[in-house]
């Protein structure tokens, strides 16, 4: 069964968790197993979220970094926290081999650009 693991950076500000909850709820409309985890500061950690997916029966996991670009967190921290070494994209769980695929960061997308335009306009209209 496919599991989707959303990765958020995390912050000392607790509202980060609200973002994770809302994206997980949204994706749950399309996928049965969705969890989110943080790279730092907030809970659940990325490792805890992975464990939750595995406990629910995920045998293939697509990791979706909610990051805009490739950087240290993407290249080093996410694989390390998931227990992936080098090019190997599999982990062992209860005697089973679990495939983990890490999606690319969000990058540029016109739909995200539209959300930014909307935010600018709403902010401007509230203040003027």
Curated annotation (Swiss-Prot):
InterPro entries from the UniProt entry: CbiX-like, SiroHydchlorin_Cochelatase, Sirohydro_Cobaltochel/CbiX
Reaction catalysis annotation: Co-sirohydrochlorin + 2 H(+) = sirohydrochlorin + Co(2+)
Annotated keywords: Cobalamin biosynthesis, Cobalt, Lyase, Metal-binding
SUPFAM superfamilies xrefs: Chelatase (SSF53800)
Entry-linked Pfam families: CbiX
Positions bound to substrate: 43, 68-73
Top-level lineage group: Archaea
HAMAP family per record: CbiX
Subunit structure: Homotetramer; dimer of dimers.
Family: Belongs to the CbiX family. CbiXS subfamily.
Name the UniProt record assigns to this protein: Sirohydrochlorin cobaltochelatase
């Amino acid at each position: 069964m496919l599991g989707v693991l959303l990765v958020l950076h995390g912050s000392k500000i607790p509202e980060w968790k609200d973002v994770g909850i809302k994206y997980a709820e949204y994706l749950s409309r399309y996928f049965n197993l969705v969890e989110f985890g943080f790279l730092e500061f907030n809970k659940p950690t990325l490792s805890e979220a992975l464990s939750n997916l595995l406990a629910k029966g995920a045998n293939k996991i697509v990791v979706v970094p909610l990051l805009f670009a490739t950087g240290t967190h993407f290249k080093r921290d996410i694989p390390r926290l998931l227990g992936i070494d080098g090019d190997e994209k599999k982990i062992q769980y209860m005697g089973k081999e679990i495939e983990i695929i890490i999606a690319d960061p969000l990058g540029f997308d016109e739909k995200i650009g539209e959300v930014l335009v909307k935010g600018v306009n709403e902010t401007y209209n509230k203040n003027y």
